[in-house]
Amino acid sequence: GPMGPSGPRGIPGPPGAPGPQGFASGPMGPRGPPGPPGKNGDDGEAGKPGRPGERGPPGPQGARGIPGTAGIPGMKGHRGFSGIDGAKGDAGPAGPKGEPGSPGENGAPGQMGPRGIPGERGRPGAPGPAGARGNDGATGAAGPPGPTGPAGPPGFPGAVGAKGEAGPQGARGSEGPQGVRGEPGPPGPAGAAGPAGNPGADGQPGAKGANGAPGIAGAPGFPGARGPSGPQGPSGPPGPKGNSGEPGAPGSKGDTGAKGEPGPTGIQGPPGPAGEEGKRGARGEPGPTGIPGPPGERGGPGARGFPGSDGVAGPKGPAGERGAPGPAGPKGSPGEAGRPGEAGIPGAKGITGSPGSPGPDGKTGPPGPAGQDGRPGPPGPPGARGQAGVMGFPGPKGAAGEPGKAGERGVPGPPGAVGPAGKDGEAGAQGPPGPAGPAGERGEQGPAGSPGIGAPGPSGARGERGFPGERGVQGPPGPAGPRGANGAPGNDGAKGIQGMPGERGAAGIPGPKGDRGDAGPKGADGSPGKDGVRGITGPIGPPGPAGAPGDKGESGPSGPAGPTGARGAPGDRGEPGPPGPAGFAGPPGADGQPGAKGEPGDAGAKGDAGPPGPAGPTGPPGPIGNVGAPGPKGARGSAGPPGATGFPGAAGRVGPPGPSGNAGPPGPPGPVGKEGGKGPRGETGPAGRPGEAGPPGPPGPAGEKGSPGADGPAGAPGTPGPQGIAGQRGVVGIPGQRGERGFPGIPGPSGEPGKQGPSGASGERGPPGPVGPPGIAGPPGESGREGAPGAEGSPGRDGSPGPKGDRGETGPAGPPGAPGAPGAPGPVGPAGKSGDRGETGPAGPAGPIGPVGARGPAGPQGPRGDKGETGEQGDRGIKGHRGFSGIQGPPGPPGSPGEQGPSGASGPAGPRGPPGSAGAPGKDGINGIPGPIGPPGPRGRTGDAGPVGPPGPPGPPGPPGPP
């Protein structure tokens, strides 16, 4: 006999273990001094649109509409005399069109069928593109300022590690769970059907193919390029004011300085406190008229003094000691999201794994709730061709009726009942932070006051010391002063408050890849999972090649009569036979039976794609966002209404400024103010003089870590302690077993995009502080005692993979989601394999012809059917006698279209014939397109603590002491 079919494909061997990975780069050098703050980066690119939601299952088919009333049949024509064929009668007029039936109600959804036998595992698709790089983390709060250390020399780049040798062949892992069956691709073009071949002899079964050789281990992919760093986040809100410095010792009287040029008119200050009743002083010379200040509280009547002589201005006193640094300000808002990093180089294609063992049949799940009417699904696959019935006796040829017109499309049925509300799913992983809004513009500066009138008068005598005024706004920090000499070692200071945790160190160098672990024992079989939701019906595959015809089966008993079929198209007119002998003209005969059903015509071409469906309903609003961080302290309220204007008194001489008072305790935090509207942009004020830097304080010892207490009320901000000593690295934990991959959840509805909040108002710039002398460096403190154990250390390197866990149960099917927007057409899938050709059964006897029912509404166009099989050639009939030519009769009136009788009952199925010869194996399908980029993965573990960074720049100087 001929050669048997090819054996099944061998199981691919297990993949080889990848070699160890070399270092991507050398060790990181010491951290350099912090650079100047960068400008805000441009807005990040808009996120990619989410993939469209899954298509809902098609709704149940509505009940068939009530058929319309049949049209009035045409007039019955007289039968012509038999003779030569008369002229063909015209078709009768069509009956009135029936009204469309009312749409039927949706049927209840049927129960889920038993789970089918799993098919062969498909080839793995090409690896998808690398996931987008996650957003950069938020900028941490700045640590306490310290002296600037010298920048260390840059480290040498480490040598690239040599490529490791390939590891030994790993043991075969336990078989994985059954993969989710992929959706079939769209149908390919139908090939032309070949002629039917002669039935071949039964082939011998082919020998089983040898197992395929194990695949070669793929080379490790190159590490993806590091994405650009995100822009620097905006600076945090300013910290609270520091305590004022102690007043300095009064300086000795200096020489009179030269008279300075009059300065620009300052901004009107807030009203001062009420003054005490002044003593009677010497009468002063009338000075120039100054700018009227804000009305203060009215003081008691002072005695009129005599004018005194001009006093000599004293020398400038030394700067007071530096005040304690203020507490650290709240953590700044996270910076804008960085641009997505460049996609990494796609890794090498992995080795095809061995197919998993088929899982146990799942139990039938409970019927799901009735879903909403889905969009019309793709056309289903063509049904299996029925067995041919026994050819009936040919009936007399009827008059050809006019082909009917297609009925109009029925009215769409009402939407189905809304299913019950779905339960809230588990909260998904936190999404990446959205892009930060643009920074608000700075408000416009108010107009400057009008300049004073009059010439400057001589300096007056030194007045008595006034009440301390309110503390002015702290000026900008000045440049760092020269470092003073080291002082004598001081006594041990008191234990300081525990410092705030330092900034997170830079990420460490990734360690070498760990060795592949030994395969664990195979887990126990999982319990049968619940039946999953039925997938969307795939498109029709291309028709397979025609198989060899099978042996003719034996005739079986007649089957029951089938339902009345739809009216078929009129058959082709038969070839005229030879004329018979002329007979005598007989009486008009009865109406003939309708002709036999003609061969079905070729199916029409596939129609154009319909218009896209309507857009789905708008999703529910997204969840309420987290409460934002408290805003900065509100601006100072405006002054109260001015009192009644008194009579202008004589302008007094300007007294020396009093010393700064001690700062009072901070008041309780006020209520959160409402966000005001965006103010006009202010003009940039003049830059103040930079103050000199004071000496840095000695670092205190690290405090012990206390147990967390209950949240108390917000207290007054305290002074920050020195930076604590970094804790020891924690013990590396044992890596847990890797869980199996869960089934993908239904994508939730998209939330509404957040709106940008209004920009806060810009504060006024304070006056510049005076330049103080360089301070004396304090003595270095002693090393503190060892601190408490630090926070949990960063995770160690990746451990060996544990054994594969048992397969989890399939979760219950969720309610169908709302239909999404129409998706883009998918790619062309691989061509399916040819199916076996069905057997041709014997034809059953022809049943009686029944009445024709009323024509129902036209259904939707079905898929193109397979080309029918060529029937067996019938025996040639006996040549009849040549008849006499008859007299041509007059043409009869148009006859009414004959009604088609019901189809005969299908004959019984014959015995299964021997299998045909195996067809040629189909070509391997092309790899599927890469899937969409998955959602961002969970946040990675915290890296090891980096080296302690250099101390920050010195803080701003304290307020000046009294002269």
Curated annotation (Swiss-Prot):
Tissue: Forms the fibrils of tendon, ligaments and bones. In bones, the fibrils are mineralized with calcium hydroxyapatite.
Residues annotated with Phosphoserine modification: 82, 558
Domain of life: Eukaryota
Gene Ontology CC terms, in alphabetical order: collagen trimer; extracellular matrix; extracellular space
Compartments where located: Secreted; Secreted, Extracellular space; Secreted, Extracellular space, Extracellular matrix
Modification note: Prolines at the third position of the tripeptide repeating unit (G-X-Y) are hydroxylated in some or all of the chains.
Region of interest called Disordered, as start-end residue ranges on this chain: 1-963
Biased composition (Basic and acidic residues): 40-54, 864-878
Low complexity biased stretches: 90-106, 129-142, 190-229, 313-337, 349-375, 384-403, 482-495, 555-569, 582-609, 638-654, 683-692, 702-726, 849-863, 897-930
Record's keyword terms, sorted: Calcium, Collagen, Extracellular matrix, Hydroxylation, Phosphoprotein, Repeat, Secreted
Annotated Pro residues bias: 144-156, 611-623, 767-777, 813-828, 948-963
Comp. bias (Gly residues): 296-305
Record-linked Pfam families: Collagen
Homology family: Belongs to the fibrillar collagen family.
PANTHER family: COLLAGEN ALPHA (PTHR24023), COLLAGEN TRIPLE HELIX REPEAT (PTHR24023:SF1082)
Assembly with partners or alone: Trimers of one alpha 2(I) and two alpha 1(I) chains.
Function: Type I collagen is a member of group I collagen (fibrillar forming collagen).
Name the record gives this protein: Collagen alpha-1(I) chain
